[in-house]
A protein has these predicted regions:
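Aromatic/basic-lined ligand-recognition segments
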Residues: 232-244
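Generic long, charged, amphipathic alpha-helical segments
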Residues: 223-233
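Conserved small/polar residues in nucleotide/adenosyl-binding loops
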Residues: 247-249
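Active-site loops and adjacent core secondary-structure elements that bind or stabilize anionic groups
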Residues: 1-191, 195, 216
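Charged, low-complexity helical/coil segments in non-catalytic cytosolic or luminal regions
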Residues: 201-214
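Short acidic alpha-helical/loop segments enriched in Asp/Glu that coordinate divalent cations
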Residues: 211-223
Length: 249
C-alpha cells in the first residue's frame, strides 16, 4: 500500500544521505533581488495563437529524438554516417521530410498555442501567481556544502517578478490521418506521422519560446542566434517542461 511505499521511499532517501528541507534551503541559489533589474513584459496576461504556419517550424525541428522512435541511437546528424544503420537513418529522414512536405502542403495538421505572462513572487519552494500557489521541489541530495540545492522557485524574485507559461500542440488533425492509414493497414506511416507531429510540437515550443523572449516579453534580442544554438538552449531564460503531449487547446 501507499503508506509502506512512502516509508520505504524516505528510508531509502535517508540511506542515500539526503538533506532535510531546512538544511537544503541553506544551500539554495542566492540572487540579490534588491539590485537585480527585472524587465516588465510588453504583453501581460494570456494570448491564444491559432493555426500557426507549420512551414515556419521546419527550421526549428530537432531531428535527434526522431530516430529514438525507431530505436536508432545516436546524435543527429552524426547518426546519418553510422556504419551500422546510417543508411536506414537516411531513408527514415527522407520519408519523414516527404511526409512533412505533404502535411504542410495539404494543411493536414494544425498548430495552436496558448501562453501567458503573469506577476509572480516566491518563498522557499513556492511561487505564487495571481493568488495560485505552485510548488517546485528542492533538490535534497547532499552534494557538499559548497554546492547548490536548486528549486525553480529560486529564480523568481521574493519581491515582484514575472513568470511565463505556455502549452502548444501540433497534433490537431492527426486522428483523421491515422484513421486513413489504419484503413490501409500501414503501420509504418502511422508511426511516422506520430513522430512528425511530436517533432513539430517540440519545434513549436522552441519557436514560441523565442517569440516570447524577443517579442512578447522583450527581454532578449537574439539578433545573431542561429537555430543550432537555439536548439542547444544558448539563450537567456529557461524552458522547464513537464512533458510533451499532443493535446487539443
Amino acid at each position: 500500500d501507499y503508506i509502506s511505499i512512502r516509508k520505504s521511499f524516505f528510508q531509502k532517501d535517508h540511506k542515500n544521505n539526503n538533506l532535510d528541507i531546512e538544511s537544503a534551503r541553506t544551500r539554495k541559489f542566492q540572487e540579490d533581488w534588491d539590485t537585480y533589474a527585472i524587465i516588465d513584459p510588453k504583453l501581460k496576461g494570456k494570448k491564444v495563437i491559432k493555426d500557426f504556419p507549420l512551414a515556419e517550424l521546419v527550421d526549428y525541428i530537432d531531428w535527434g529524438p526522431f530516430f529514438h522512435t525507431w530505436e536508432l541511437k545516436g546524435k543527429y546528424p552524426d547518426i546519418l554516417k553510422n556504419e551500422k544503420y546510417g543508411e536506414q537513418a537516411k531513408l527514415l529522414l527522407d520519408d519523414a521530410n516527404a511526409m512533412l512536405s505533404e502535411v504542410i502542403k495539404n494543411n493536414e495538421l494544425t498548430a495552436d498555442a496558448v501562453f501567458g505572462i503573469y506577476q509572480a513572487t516566491s518563498k522557499d519552494e513556492n511561487v505564487t501567481v495571481e493568488g495560485h500557489k505552485f510548488n517546485f521541489p528542492r533538490q535534497l541530495v547532499d552534494k557538499g556544502s559548497d554546492k547548490i540545492n536548486y528549486s525553480l522557485a529560486d529564480f523568481i524574485s521574493t519581491n515582484q517578478d514575472w513568470i511565463g507559461m505556455f502549452a502548444v500542440t501540433a497534433g490537431k488533425g492527426i486522428e483523421s490521418i491515422i484513421s486513413r492509414y489504419e484503413k490501409e493497414h500501414d503501420d509504418y506511416k502511422i508511426i511516422m506521422i506520430k513522430a512528425i507531429a511530436d517533432r513539430l510540437a517540440e519545434a513549436f515550443a522552441e519557436k514560441l519560446h523565442q517569440m516570447i523572449r524577443v517579442d512578447f516579453w522583450g527581454y532578449s534580442s537574439e539578433k545573431n542566434l542561429e537555430i543550432k544554438n537555439l536548439i542547444k538552449e544558448e539563450y537567456d531564460g529557461i524552458r522547464p517542461a513537464p512533458g510533451l503531449s499532443l493535446i487539443h487547446i
